[in-house]
């Protein structure tokens, strides 16, 4: 079995007001081209097909056309799950008959325990889930974090393992290294915050993950993030984007890079130097610019946009350093809950839910009481 592992398409996403739909259409052609050239048996999309739970009409049309092209025209089996940015009910509309065309779209926990069998491989499609959903499914209030939830889920999936097949998990969550020791009190494991241990995922021959946009977020030969296929923020400017080509027998994983349609560049310099060097820069790419000038420059953003039309952020070095110093000082004095919420937001791009906040406060209070 040979398949492509991709994730986090975020169709409909914008970059500081700039639509990325045209770039996403062009990038899709690269993905399709690789699938054809490598003669893959299937294409796996590990969640976050859309950027919003309520995508606009253009985003829906673009994704529908992409999936129809891969599945109906090119005849590739497609295996996909809903991510935290997707609306499972909306995404699952039509899923009952999609499978008759070898388009397997899983949006419910219950369906994750029925593997899709293609060739020598069983694919277990596990959509993004909340802790409470798993507690309710197993009627087990002792499930208090994501790793415990996954331990129950994996144990249930193993009941369906066919001994003569390879076993692939497709999922959308935060995975990290080995489990911490039981006496560690520095690790705050909050519902939805704690990572899934790689040890929990050991029964699978390969784990195709989505959620984190950097393929280097986890270094494991058989448990991998594909990362997003394109750069969606300035923080991803230096990341290489692409997807994994996976062979299950003999097992082999190969990284397939994708070329940015319009790249994101980080530029730093004086106004004069930026204007002088503009001719050497691609006009249609995106730019994050840090100005080193100390004096005031009237209408600087519009003047720079005459040379760099797609400026997504503009900073002044003197102010940027001041902001960094203030942020460091604030962080040093911040309460543990504030640090936790900031970390979660920076890591996942989402805010803590009311339930997560409540559990976080309770856990922190318990830790404080042990001191």
Task: Enumerate the predicted regions with their spans.
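Conserved beta-strand segments of alpha/beta enzyme cores
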Residues: 2, 77, 104, 122, ...
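Divalent metal-coordination and catalytic microenvironments
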Residues: 8, 28, 43, 48, ...
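N-terminal active-site segment of His-dependent metallophosphoesterases
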Residues: 1-67, 75, 169, 357-366, ...
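His/Asp/Glu-rich metal-coordinating catalytic cores
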Residues: 55, 79-208, 212-219
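Short, conserved loop/helix-junction motifs that constitute active-site signature segments
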Residues: 72-74, 162-163, 199-203, 280-282, ...
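Catalytic-core regions built around general acid/base machinery
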Residues: 62-74, 193-204
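A conserved active-site cap/scaffold subdomain adjacent to cofactor or substrate pockets
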Residues: 198-201, 205-260
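Accessory, non-catalytic peripheral segments of nucleic-acid enzymes
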Residues: 37, 42, 247-371
């Amino acid at each position: 079995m040979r398949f492509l592992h991709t994730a986090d398409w975020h169709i409909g996403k914008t970059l500081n007001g700039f639509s990325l739909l045209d770039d996403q259409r062009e990038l899709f052609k690269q993905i399709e081209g690789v699938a054809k050239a490598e003669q893959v048996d299937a294409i796996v999309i590990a969640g976050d097909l859309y950027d919003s739970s309520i995508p606009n009409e253009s985003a829906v049309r673009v994704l529908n056309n992409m999936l129809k092209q891969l599945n109906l025209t090119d005849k590739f089996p497609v295996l996909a799950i809903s991510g935290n940015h997707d609306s499972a009910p909306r995404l699952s509309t039509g899923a009952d008959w999609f499978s008759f065309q070898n388009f397997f779209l899983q949006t419910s926990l219950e369906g994750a325990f029925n593997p899709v069998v293609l060739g020598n491989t069983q694919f277990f499609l596990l959509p993004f889930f909340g802790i409470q959903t798993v507690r309710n499914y197993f009627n087990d209030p002792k499930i208090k974090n994501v790793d415990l939830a996954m331990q129950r889920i994996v144990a249930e999936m193993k009941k369906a393992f066919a001994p003569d097949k390879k076993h692939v998990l497709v999922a959308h969550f935060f995975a990290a290294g080995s489990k911490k020791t039981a006496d560690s009190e520095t690790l705050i494991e909050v519902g939805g915050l704690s990572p899934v241990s790689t040890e929990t995922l050991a029964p699978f021959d390969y784990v195709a993950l989505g959620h984190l946009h950097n393929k280097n977020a986890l270094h494991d030969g058989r448990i991998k993030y594909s990362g997003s296929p394109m750069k969606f923020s300035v923080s991803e400017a230096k990341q290489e984007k692409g997807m994994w080509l996976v062979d299950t027998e003999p097992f082999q994983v190969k990284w397939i890079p994708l070329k940015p349609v319009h790249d994101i560049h980080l530029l730093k310099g004086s106004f004069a130097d930026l204007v002088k060097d503009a001719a050497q820069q691609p006009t249609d790419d995106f730019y994050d610019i840090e100005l080193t000038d100390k004096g005031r420059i009237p209408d600087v953003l519009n003047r720079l946009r005459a040379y760099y039309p797609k400026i997504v952020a503009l900073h002044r070095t003197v102010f940027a350093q001041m902001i960094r110093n203030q942020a460091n000082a604030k962080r040093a004095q911040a309460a543990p809950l504030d640090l936790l919420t900031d970390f979660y937001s920076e890591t996942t791009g989402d805010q803590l839910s009311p339930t997560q906040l409540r559990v976080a406060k309770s856990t922190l209070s318990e830790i404080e009481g042990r001191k």
